[in-house]
Amino acid sequence: MRLPEAVHLPVTDLPVSAQAINATASRRSMRFIDEFRDGELARGLAAAIRQAARPDRDYRFMEFCGGHTHAIARYGVTDLLPPNVHMIHGPGCPVCVLPIGRIDMAIRLVREAGVTLCSYGDPLRVPASGGLSLLKVKAALGRDGNLRGDLRMIYSGADALAFAQQHPERQVVFLAIGFETTTPPTAVLIRQAQALGLRNFSVLCCHVLTPPAIASILAATEVRQWGSVSLDGFIGPAHVSTIIGTRPYERFAEEYRKPVVVAGFEPLDVMLAILMLIKQVNAGRALVENEFSRAVTRAGNHKAQHLVSEVFELRRSFAWRGLGELPYSALRIRQAFADFDAEQRFAVRYEAVADHPACECGAVLRGVKQPQQCRIFGSVCTPENPIGSCMVSSEGACAAHYSFGRFTDAAPSADADFPGSPQASG
């Protein structure tokens, strides 16, 4: 396989090769994934990072997106970095940031309102109150004749809409989660339901927004009171940025003097973004740069943005796991589409619930702790038995570290005093 043009550049010239790599990828659309995982180019980028990183200082960069967290763990990117370059995990996993109270709302819709709840697979496994989860509720439905509801795992919101059309006798609720990437498809579903005149379809909207979460990491008192982490810059999310563009991040560069580099999900994307951030920090600059130019523009997707603004509006406040109540950080369904708002149709309300006291998921989401610093990581809390939401999704920091061998330094005897552990139960 012929390497991208960038591999033929001297190591010191690699920072300017983002355009060359993206151009090469665009010309070879069927082969570019292999090129973005090329070992020789990765070694060149690793050497460039080592050369650029000043030995007299530390660099602390947050990858906001769970997809980047997954890629960093899967490809061992941190093993290629010098010891003074640190990657901090952020709150960019949509399943992870859902608070327990939101899962409880979905459970009440099933158990009390008797709806058919349609959800992606990961939310079904998120721990809720009383040791429950949506998956455990689904298992109980077949045993308890008093429960009228139903739970179905789907791969697309369109599956929920189709199910509602096929079963007009059932009230079907779609559990809509995610950042700006998944919001436009939900808007399409609601518009389609309105056009079809469906009276048995509604959405439990849990869509959240990226910029307010980044702002909370940098400035919110809700985060400061729990402790936060000093950051030198951000790797901006890839898919989110295809929708909102790079313009919303300019505020963080201008107001907080934090550089942002939007990057793709491949290992070379991430490594190049780290190198670009180091170069900015060394030069005392704070700019928004776009490494992912093959898919992201400054303006983003205007059509998707217009669709979202037509169907949704800002919530005054929304509770995030680990970050608390953040103002104007999530979306709700506009009054014009209120017939399809499950919160209004079934009068279900959010009730705050504290996380498990042994779980450090909130601290991991704020960047205060690494997964291995949680005393139950890799022992009591595993992907098969998640105690916190960060161990549920493959984009969660804890699940990513566990799945790709980053759990070897988990705290010894972590489960010794944990209720319900094999040692505790004898």
Language-model features: locations:
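A conserved active-site cap/scaffold subdomain adjacent to cofactor or substrate pockets
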Residues: 224-297
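Internal helical hairpin/lid segments
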Residues: 271-363
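Residue-level detector of structural "landmarks"
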Residues: 18-19
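Metallocofactor- and cofactor-centric catalytic cores in central/energy metabolism, strongly enriched
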Residues: 27-169, 183, 187, 195-196, ...
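Flexible, glycine/charged-enriched surface loops at secondary-structure junctions
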Residues: 58-61, 200-201, 284-293, 319-321, ...
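Phosphate/pyrophosphate-binding betaalpha-module
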Residues: 175, 179-248
